[in-house]
Amino acid sequence: MKQFILLQVVFLIGLSATSQKPCSRPEFRQFDFWIGEWEAFAPNGNKGGDSKISIILDSCVILEEWTSANAQQGLIYSGKSFNMYNAATHQWQQTWVDNTGNTTEFLRGEGKDGKIIYYADKVVDAKGKNFIRRLTFTKLDNDKVRQLGERSDDGGKTWTTEYDLEYRRKK
């Protein structure tokens, strides 16, 4: 009987220790400005798509669900990203997956001053060429976020814009 009571006490102590949300510290909350439902627009005003951003896994992961506004070659492009702050490396990370079979792993990222900047160091394009991808999210105000995707073919010395989107919160 004593062993049973001791086991229950140990279980309850462990439960109370884990009941504190491990991802509630400020560094985990740096990207919360992106949570919500959005329409994304290119600089020319054309709608690029819709994105739903939610918080999952006990507030440890930010999930993006993207759907393009228009079909290309009969396919409506869609994808998901999983964004998280890695407590061990003190870096933001993103894994992007889409319905064309592509993935991108952004294993380095930092958050500060209303920005999250990711880097994917090992990206290969359709021609088999390696390059670096940089992805920057900037909070413009409470209802607007800029997402800028860039690539570098020279190890990060110069950058070329791949896309530039302004996310506008759906009302």
Q: Residue locations for each model-derived region?
A:
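Bacterial Sec-dependent N-terminal signal peptides
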Residues: 1-22
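Hydrophobic small-molecule pocket/channel-lining residues, especially in calycin-type beta-barrels
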Residues: 19-171
